[in-house]
Amino acid sequence: MTSSSVPPLSASAKKIGIVMMSAVGDAVHVMPVIHALKAHAPSARISWVLQPGPATLVRGHPLVDDIVLFDRSRGWRAFIDVRRELQSRPFDVVLALQVYFKAGLVTSFTHSPIKLGFDRERARDANWLFTTHRIPSHAGQHVQDQYFEFLDAMRVPHGAPQWSLGPWNDEERVWQRDFIQQFDRPIAPIVIATSKAAKDWMPERWGAVCHILWNEFGLQPVLVGGRSDRELAAEAIILRDAPMACSALGSGLRKLSAILDGAAVALSPDTGPLHLAIALRTPVISLVGYTNPKRVGPYDFAHDLMIDAYGEPGEDYPIDMSYRLDRMPRISVDDVHAMLTRWRERYSTARIADLATRYSR
C-alpha cells in the first residue's frame, strides 16, 4: 500500500506509536514530527519505542507521553521485553521511522490497523514486510524531510520544525546558569568524538582550535560528549595541548542540552549534539566528511557554518546514504578558523547580546 490508501489521521486519534529506537540525532529529528502530531491531535497519547541513550534526552518532554525502552544491551531479551510492553498497547497508527530489521521486528510487535513505514525502495532489510502502509517513493532528501513525508501521507499539517529541547524546569535552568556563570567569558562547546571513528576530527587539531577560541575570539572552550575510550583519549590529548579548555564529558544529554543552549558557538562533527545545537538555535560549526551533509547536515540553521569535506570541489553529489572514508583529515585548522571568523561576522553580536541578557549576574 502507498499513501493513496493511508487514511488521514483523525484529529480525535487517541493513541499513536513511534518506532525510532537508535541515535540521538534521529531522536532530535523525530521531535518536529511529534510537535505536528500533537498540534493536529491534541488528545492523542504518544508512545515512543526508544533505546536508553536517546531516551534520556526526551524523557520528561511535555509532548512525549510514554517511552517504551528497547535496551539492546540485553541482546535477544530486549525483544522479549519490548514485545511484552507492547502487548497491551493498541494504537490508532504506528509510525515506523526506522528502516532496519530490528526495528521492523519491533514494529511487528505493535497492534495497529495502520503501521506506516518507508516505501520498498528505502526500507532496508525487507523492513517493508513489517508495515501495512507505506509512504510513496521519493527522491533522496534530508532526514528531517523524510520524516515529514509521514505527516504528509496522513494529511497532518506541519510548518517550520519545532523541538522544545532546551532546559524544561527550574532545576535544569539553575544548573545551566551556575555552569555558565563559572566562566568569565562565553563558552564554546566542542563535541570531541562520535560513535564512529571515521566521523571524528583529530584531537590535536581540536587542541589548536582551543587556542584560537581562547586567544582570538575570547571564548572558553568546553569539551563535551560521553566517556567512551576514544572520547577519554581525545580529552587527554586536547587538555595536554590546550590546558585552558574545560572538560564536561559525561554530563549526560539533558545537561549537554543546557550547555549547548547557553553557548556562544558550538563545534561538532556529524553526531547527535550537532543536531541538538541546531534544534536549540545555537550557532554551530559543523565538520562533515564521512556522511552525506545533504542528507544529515544542519537542517535549517547555520548551514553557512558547515565545512563540507564529503564532496570534491564543485561536485554535485547525490543525496544518498553513501559513506566516504578518510575525508575528515581534509578539514584543516584554518578551515575551522575561517568558519569562526564567519560566525563572528554573522552571528556573534546578536548571540552574545542574548546570552548577556539571559545570564547576567
Regions found by a protein language model. Name each.
Residues 1-361:
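Catalytic machinery of carbohydrate-active enzymes
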